[in-house]
Swiss-Prot record:
Cofactor binding, note field: Binds 1 Mg(2+) ion per subunit.
Organism: Schizosaccharomyces pombe (strain 972 / ATCC 24843) (Fission yeast)
Domain of life: Eukaryota
Pfam families per UniProt: Anth_synt_I_N, Chorismate_bind
UniProt subunit comment: Tetramer of two components I and two components II.
Involved pathway(s): Amino-acid biosynthesis; L-tryptophan biosynthesis; L-tryptophan from chorismate: step 1/5
Transmembrane regions listed in the UniProt entry: none
Keyword Phosphoprotein in annotation: yes
Binding annotation for L-tryptophan: S54, P262, Y263, M264
GO cellular component: anthranilate synthase complex; cytosol; nucleus
Residues annotated with Phosphoserine modification: S390, S392, S488
UniProt-recorded name of the protein: Probable anthranilate synthase component 1
Length: 489
């Protein structure tokens, strides 16, 4: 297998860019591999690992799947801004551009919980029950990863030449080549170490933390605040907990087929797992441009093409949904313009329909060119959490919803994504349609935007619609494994 770039080219890149980490890679065909199989082969027995995918049509969105594990883990302790440490770590790396690599070839993969807003807006901090007990943020620092190029049906095996004073660059290059060859050997092994799946029982009941009456009370309370002029909009949520005998990776494998989404992810964090199919980009940094995708307004998918189109037309004609959406686009413009040049901030797309497996949404795009005195982390802090999961004005809405929910949201409505070694490389989604698996229980959470004319029953049903795709994935996966057990008995 040929390695790109070669040693001489790496030496030239290191000198030209004053780099201390340079990516190199080899390429193998992907015709006998899938991302799920590659993940299993590469991460057997590892306590921490990840797979990031985009299972949608369109090369610009879904070209690559990324698989890897960390060489070091950054875990938030609940005392200081977790992004500050991540920013310091990434700044220590000076890399160089290498042709032929995907947009992400090394850096950090992880999550930022919704409750980290207290570090960016201290007035939102208040005592809250910590039901799940997860770290506030976690980042996997990764130099070695596998990128599936779905456009060309190849696999790029990536490692980094770590250049250190006193260490010959030839030695560092050979160490990186050795890692690539070890990964190649694992990928080409005929053995697929399937997850250990115990006997699956059906019929476990899902339990809400607030119930139907509790959620409707949230809506009524927030409508009073809207009527009194305290806020324009807010986003309460409910969390459901459900036992399951499924291995969490088996659940992810099925989820990616029944709910293909722009942001698919499975992150294994030792004693808990994050399984997601998010439709919504939070913030992306691309060639100096900051991009945000507000999603607000939801209707179900129809059983027929005609019914599907009727639902979409109703959504586009809904005065309530359009008003709410415009409000959140304005909030997104404000968040983006705080870190971007005002004359470059624009609404690139306004209120288009995007269809997913179980729901349809109104979607817009807001973007701007990052100011020279700002960084991608400033952009993240400005936009986080998204107005679509918090409200408007954002800080007051967060305070009011926290006062009702009285629990930490954890990963729900936070962010999952990747931050490259390059200064302008960041791609994060909102952690919605996301499940947390811990100790044999799956936790799911969903909310909806409340405005002055919201109907309590409609809003409650909307949360159920948003939960449905993941609940269905759990139920269908359980049935599949139960049927396999019965047929082999």
């Amino acid at each position: 297998m040929k390695i790109y770039p070669d040693l001489k080219q790496v030496q030239e890149l290191a000198e030209k860019h004053k780099a201390n980490k340079i990516p190199i890679y080899g390429v193998i065909p992907a015709d006998m591999l899938t991302p799920s199989v590659a993940y299993l082969k590469l991460n057997q027995g590892k306590k921490y690992s990840f797979i990031l995918e985009s299972v949608t049509q369109g090369e610009s969105v879904s070209r690559y799947s990324f698989i890897g594990s960390p060489y070091r883990i950054l875990m938030a302790n609940g005392k200081t801004d977790p992004l500050a440490r991540l920013e310091r770590e990434l700044k220590e790396v000076k890399t160089a551009p290498v042709e032929g690599l995907p947009s992400f070839s090394g850096g950090a993969v992880g999550y930022v919980s919704y409750d980290c807003i207290k570090y960016f807006e201290p007035t939102t901090e208040m005592p809250l029950e910590d039901t799940l007990g997860l770290p506030e943020a976690m980042f996997f620092m990764t130099d070695d990863l596998v990128a599936f190029d779905h456009a060309y049906q190849t696999v790029k095996i990536i490692s980094h030449v770590c250049i250190q004073q006193g260490r010959p660059i030839e030695e560092a290059y050979e160490a990186a080549v050795f890692k690539i060859n070890m990964l190649k050997k694992k990928l080409e092994s005929p053995e697929i170490p399937l997850p250990e799946q115990k006997k699956v029982h059906l019929g476990y009941e899902a339990k809400s933390n607030v119930g139907e009456d509790g959620y409707k009370a949230f809506v009524s309370n927030l409508k009073e605040h809207i009527f009194n002029g305290d806020i324009f909009q807010a986003v309460p949520s409910q969390r459901i907990a459900r036992r399951t005998d499924l291995h969490p990776f088996n659940l992810y494998r099925h989820l990616r087929t029944v709910n293909p989404s722009p942001y698919m992810f499975y992150i294994h964090c030792d004693d808990f797992d994050i399984i997601g199919a998010s439709p919504e980009l939070l913030v992306k940094s691309e060639h100096g441009r900051i991009i945000n995708h507000p999603i607000a307004g939801t209707v179900p998918r129809g059983k027929t093409k005609e019914e599907d189109e009727a639902y979409a037309k109703d959504l586009l004609a809904s005065v309530k949904d359009r008003a709410e959406h415009v409000m959140l686009v304005d909030l997104a413009r404000n968040d983006v313009s705080r870190v971007c040049d005002l004359d470059t901030t624009s609404v690139d797309k306004l209120m288009t329909i995007e269809k997913f497996s179980h729901v349809q949404h109104l979607v817009s795009q807001v973007s701007g060119v990052l100011r020279p005195d700002k960084t991608r982390f400033d952009a993240f802090r400005s936009i986080f959490p998204a107005g679509t999961v918090s409200g408007s004005p954002k800080v007051r809405a967060i305070q009011l919803v926290y006062g009702l929910e009285k629990e930490k949201r954890g990963i729900y409505a936070g962010a999952v994504g990747r931050w490259g070694y390059e200064d302008d490389n960041m791609d994060t989604c909102i952690a919605i349609r996301t499940m947390v698996y811990k100790d044999g229980t799956v936790y799911l959470q969903a909310g909806g935007g409340i405005v002055f004319d919201s109907d309590e029953q409609d809003e409650y049903v909307e949360t159920l619609n948003k939960l449905r795709s993941n609940v269905t994935a759990i139920e269908e996966t359980e049935k599949l494994y139960a049927e396999e057990e019965n047929s082999s008995a």
